[in-house]
Each structure stands twice: as C-alpha cells, then as structure tokens.
Amino acid sequence: MNIQVRRFQRGAEAEFVTGLEWLFDPPGSRPPDWDRDRAVERTAQVLADENVALFAARSHENRLVGVASIYLDIASVRFGRRASIEDLAVHPEWRSRGVGAGLLTTAKEWAQEHGADYIFLESGVARTEAHRFYLRQGATHAAAAFRWTIGQPR
C-alpha cells in the first residue's frame, strides 16, 4: 500500500470534515444535529490547539483516503498521561488496504512524542469490523463508554 500520512494544516478544514463524514456510512449514521459549517469552524479551532493533531492519509495520486484526530487528554492518577483518538475514518473504497493502520501508527507515534503513556479510543457499538481492526492492531477492550448530552452544540 502506497499511502502517505501527514498532518493537516490550516486551510484544509473542509477537507478534514469530508473525511469525517465517511463515519456516517453504514454501520454509522449522521448525527441528527450534524452541521457541516459548524464542523468546519470547530476544525479550525482544533487546528489551533498545540495538544491536538489531525492527520490525512493520501494515495499516490494525492487523493484523501483517510483522516484521524488525536489529542492529549488528562493526566490520570492511575494510568499516567492519556492521549485520545477522537476520529479515525477511512474512505469506504480504501478500507482493509492499510490506510487505518498507517493513520493509527502515525497517531501512536505522535502521542508517544508528546509524552502520552497510553491511548484511549471509543468506537460506536455497531462498528464491529472496526473493533476487530483495533484488536488486530494490539488494542485491548478496556471499557464500556457512556454519554450524557448536557447542552446544545456550539
């Protein structure tokens, strides 16, 4: 597989959001309150944060085929400094071709370079193929995740 993984730079916010929207393909779904313009604005805010990295995987034709985001999170008393992979999305035509592994490797390297002791990743319960991929990549099934919506999206 001939892909290159590089960090997104300012000005590429809309392209990153396009990659995120691949998460809406089955078995995923579009969130009911999804607003693409708001997502582009949030991506610009995220790109300005030094504790966050957004990555693009590109084919040899420079086509966007995958995206990932990772951020430094809490310093846990029990486990040390955590990095969280917020998003990892691969274009449907490029799945099972090494793109996700390339993005994951790059995100893990970034986390290690930035002092993280471990990486946390949540994945929707319906994404069983993604779960198998994460386990093949050496992850352990460590927790169940729960969510409360406490306000309106900004």
Positions of PLM-derived features:
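Conserved beta-strand-loop-alpha-helix junction that forms the acyl-donor binding cleft
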Residues: 95, 120-130, 147-149
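Conserved acetyl-CoA-binding loop of GNAT-fold acetyltransferases
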Residues: 125, 134-144
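A short helix-loop-beta-strand connector motif used in the catalytic cores of GNAT acetyltransferases and
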Residues: 44-56, 84, 140
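Helix-loop element at the rim of GNAT/NAT acetyltransferase active sites that forms part
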Residues: 18-33, 76
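Conserved acetyl-CoA-binding loop-helix of GNAT-fold acetyltransferases
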Residues: 90, 96-109, 136
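A short beta-loop-alpha structural element at the N-terminal edge
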Residues: 4-17
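Conserved GNAT acetyl-CoA-binding A-motif
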Residues: 111-123
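Conserved beta-strand in the GNAT
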Residues: 54-56, 63-72, 84, 89
